[in-house]
Curated annotation (Swiss-Prot):
Lineage: Eukaryota, Viridiplantae, Streptophyta, Embryophyta, Tracheophyta
GO molecular function per UniProt: sucrose synthase activity
Annotated EC: 2.4.1.13
Function comment: Sucrose-cleaving enzyme that provides UDP-glucose and fructose for various metabolic pathways.
Protein name, per record: Sucrose synthase
Region (GT-B glycosyltransferase): 275-752
Alphabetized UniProt keyword annotations: Glycosyltransferase, Transferase
Record-stated family: Belongs to the glycosyltransferase 1 family. Plant sucrose synthase subfamily.
Enzyme class: transferase
Catalytic activity: an NDP-alpha-D-glucose + D-fructose = a ribonucleoside 5'-diphosphate + sucrose + H(+)
Transferase in keyword set: yes
Length: 806
């Protein structure tokens, strides 16, 4: 039998060299086109557009070879004639950098730092020989296990359990960390799980077997209190369960683990340990309240997300505490900013109970400067100089409220995450990070040209805060895979922080690794009491019908709604979002305005922005101006309705269902959307949904089955897809029902708050455990981060102007 020869895998550069030899003229033609663009950056879609402009015969020759592969994987091309440097991404999380001399057709490999240095030459005056601070977090993770398969991205806890369960339980000596972990559990001075009668692994196993023997002789329903004293005498305390049956299961899980460890048993056992009683959730910016705030500046999906999150989390915590046989009252505190100028909201109230909960409160702490308390709202882009003092004030308030430390701190968005990092660092508590949106992805080239954005957005400070928090945290929750590592063709939000440069400030050669086991995908859901299917007629909120009728169809034009719908028989295309550039609402209006066929088939209704008051948000002002211009340019009155932001969530749920009654559709046209809560909400009511393929909605929707993907950069195609859908529905009404049902099924399978809250508590337990028993605490990197914070972040934060109080 012939033996197969193992051949060396050629590098990308070597394969490119071979292609250059074979197709010199064709490659030269393309590279010359790119070089002719002059000094600058070409994004992936621009590189592909240039490729499509060369003659078809040449295209065909290049498509199948190494050069075609490089082109398809190129995320950006840096043009500095005669050189073109390429950032090539063969698959998510894997990057290579090349540089081609267009005149000599010479290819060079570049290290990340070399590529970034080359890129910096685009910015005048940055290509000097001075020492540049380079950030590299890779050495701190070099000794730590790292998965390499794409399917492991976002499944960090499973990988961690597999790797470390094998490592931890290999001999008697290695069981000591587990024993110590079980002994450290207590609540307000009351010992849980094990007391000091158990001193070593041998005595633990002996006691567990003794307990197992006893429990197998009693009625499974026997409450723990009946054998509590007996167990205390042998070394076992409360926390194992509320009944003999539950305690026996927990003890058997631990015995199985000690005998033959496996990751599933480990996770199940850790799930049962009483670890989380007090949770702190940080969300400083915006108007955080429960009523009449949605649509205020910086106040949208994140507020809804957190309020839904805490309700589900409290329910799950109460359920677990009961099953653990404890009578502890949990606390969940949402920490946000107290606004003395609360403009008709409850944002000036220190403590506010969360509706539908027993033990969740919003705790508001004001921003302070040297003059005292800051009274007015401040944009999320300008909060940075206040956050260090704010952290100290929050720590003081928490000590008063909780009479102890929290067990978990969850940060939200950039400001919440850096405050969470500082608090977790100070208190030694497990930290979870939720980005919601990383602004670097939303504003292309905002890193290399950061100075252009600085006056308005202060991105240098925000990107530094993001980098600090994502490296400091114990675990990161994302709603989608795309948020971490994008897709085959698009770069993930976190992935975009792998290597980047802020010329004149610092160069990040290794900022984050998307394969890091700290990443976990935990998708949120829609509130099922509000967003339920339009077919559930007995639950429909008919009392809202007159108000919804007024919103949609009234002939009156005022600050609440302008433009009228003349033909009520037509289906409605509906969208609802903040009015900013990234949400791209004006983009959708323009697509509609330009497409005569779409206008003939359907009406368009937009809920965005607040025309009832003067906006303080510069971006919102610009988008409003654009909206008025579009109405005039395309003569939209008669087919279009613009409604000011609607803050009543319960009524909004019924509004979605009324759109379903018209056999309409929901469109989410964002340039980029981290998750897409409105997409989940619309689908949960049965409304067929068309949403951006950039970000989370690409995963929420299965194209053609539970909705449709649209490309915000090709509005004409998106409009044509809508035309195609509504023409199909006109010919066959069951097509609408099919997509509606597909959306409902997708939500039920994957996007519920119950699944979310169970997962969050499981992750807290697992990461808390590994942090204790291994080197997962990442002490070395924390020291590095302290220096980065003190020497870079603090100075950047101080450079942001303080708000002027009138």
């Amino acid at each position: 039998m012939a033996t197969e020869r193992l051949t060396r895998v050629h590098s990308l550069r070597e394969r490119l060299d071979e292609t250059l030899t074979a197709n010199r003229n064709e490659i030269l033609a393309l590279l010359s086109r790119i070089e002719a663009k002059g000094k600058g950056i070409l994004q992936h879609h621009q590189v592909i557009a240039e490729f499509e402009e060369i003659p078809e015969e040449n295209r065909q020759k290049l498509t199948d070879g190494a050069f075609g592969e490089v082109l398809r994987s190129t995320q950006e091309a840096i043009v500095l004639p005669p050189w073109v440097a390429l950032a090539v991404r063969p698959r998510p999380g894997v990057w290579e950098y090349l540089r081609v001399n267009v005149h000599a057709l010479v290819v060079e490999n570049l290290q990340p730092a070399e590529f970034l240095k080359f890129k910096e030459e685009l910015v005048d005056g940055s290509a000097n020989g001075n020492f540049v601070l380079e950030l590299d977090f890779e050495p701190f993770t070099a000794s730590f296990p790292r998965p390499t398969l794409n399917k492991s991205i976002g499944n960090g806890v499973q990988f961690l359990n597999r790797h470390l369960s094998a490592k931890l339980f290999h001999d008697k000596e290695s069981l000591h960390p587990l024993l110590e972990f079980l002994r450290l559990h207590s609540y307000k001075g009351k010992t849980l799980m094990l007391n000091d009668r158990i001193q070593n692994p041998d005595s633990l196993q002996h006691v567990l077997r003794k307990a197992e023997e006893y429990l197998s002789t009693v009625d499974p329903e026997t409450p723990y209190s009946e054998f509590e004293h007996r167990f205390q005498e042998i070394g076992l305390e409360r926390g194992w369960g509320d009944s003999a049956e539950r305690v026996l299961e927990s003890i058997q899980l631990l015995l199985d683990l000690l005998e033959a460890p496996d990751p599933c048993t480990l996770e199940t056992f850790l799930d049962r340990i009483p670890m989380v009683f007090n949770v702190v959730i940080l969300s400083p910016h915006g108007y955080f309240a429960q009523d009449d705030v949605l649509g205020y500046p910086d106040t949208g999906g994140q507020v809804v997300y957190i309020l839904d999150q805490v309700r589900a989390l409290e329910s799950e915590m109460l359920n677990r505490i009961k099953k653990q046989g404890l009578d502890i009252v949990p606390r969940i505190l949402i920490i946000t900013r107290l606004l003395p100028d609360a403009v008709g909201t409850t944002c000036g109230q220190r403590l506010e109970k969360v509706y539908g909960t027993e033990h969740c409160h919003i705790l508001r702490v004001p921003f302070r400067d040297q003059k005292g308390i800051v009274r007015k709202w401040i944009s999320r882009f300008e909060v940075w100089p206040y956050l260090e003092t704010y952290t100290e004030d929050v720590a003081h308030e928490l000590a008063k409220e909780l009479q102890g430390k929290p067990d978990l701190i969850v940060g939200n968005y950039s400001d919440g995450n850096i405050v969470a990092s500082l608090l977790a660092h100070k208190l030694g508590v497990t930290q979870c990070t939720i980005a919601h949106a990383l602004e670097k992805t939303k504003y292309p080239e905002s890193d290399i040209y950061w100075k252009k954005f600085e006056e308005k957005y202060h991105f240098s400070c925000q990107f530094t805060a993001d980098l600090f928090a994502m490296n400091h945290t114990d675990f990161i929750i994302t709603s989608t895979f795309q948020e971490i590592a994008g897709s085959k063709d698009t770069v993930g939000q976190y992935e975009s922080h792998t290597a980047f440069t802020l010329p004149g400030l610092y160069r990040v050669v290794h900022g984050i690794d998307v394969f890091d086991p700290k990443f976990n995908i935990v998708s949120p859901g829609a509130d099922q009491t509000i967003y339920f299917p339009y077919t559930e007629t007995s639950r429909r909120l008919t009392s809202f019908y007159p108000e919804i009728e007024e919103l949609l169809y009234s002939t009156v034009e005022n600050e609440e709604h302008i433009c009228v719908l003349k033909d009520r028989s037509k289906p409605i295309i509906f969208t609802m979002a903040r009015l900013d550039r990234v949400k791209n609402i004006t983009g959708l209006v323009e697509w509609y305005g330009k497409n005569a066929k779409l206008r003939e088939l359907v009406n368009l209704v937009v809920v965005a922005g607040d025309r009832r008051k003067e906006s303080k948000d510069l971006e919102e002002k610009a988008e409003m101006k654009k909206m008025y211009e579009l109405i005039e340019t395309y003569k939209l009155n008669g087919q279009f309705r613009w409604i000011s932001s609607q803050m009543n969530r319960v009524r909004n749920g019924e509004l979605y269902r009324v759109i379903c009654d018209t056999k309409g559709a929901f469109v989410q046209p964002a340039v980029y959307e981290a998750f897409g809560l409105t997409v989940v909400e619309a689908m949960a009511t049965g409304l067929p949904t068309f949403a951006t393929l950039n970000g989370g909605p690409a995963e929420i929707i299965v194209h053609g089955k539970s909705g449709f993907h649209i490309d915000p950069y090709h509005g004409d195609r998106a409009a044509d897809l809508l035309v195609e859908f509504f023409e199909k529905v006109k010919a066959d009404p069951s097509h609408w029902d099919k997509i509606s049902l597909g959306g409902l099924q997708r939500i039920e399978e994957k996007y519920t708050w119950q699944i979310y809250s169970q997962r969050l508590l499981t992750l807290t337990g697992v990461y808390g455990f590994w942090k204790h028993v291994s080197n997962l605490d990442r002490l070395e990197s924390r020291r590095y981060l302290e220096m980065f914070y003190a020497l870079k972040y603090r100075k950047l934060a101080e450079s942001v102007p303080l708000a002027v109080e009138e």
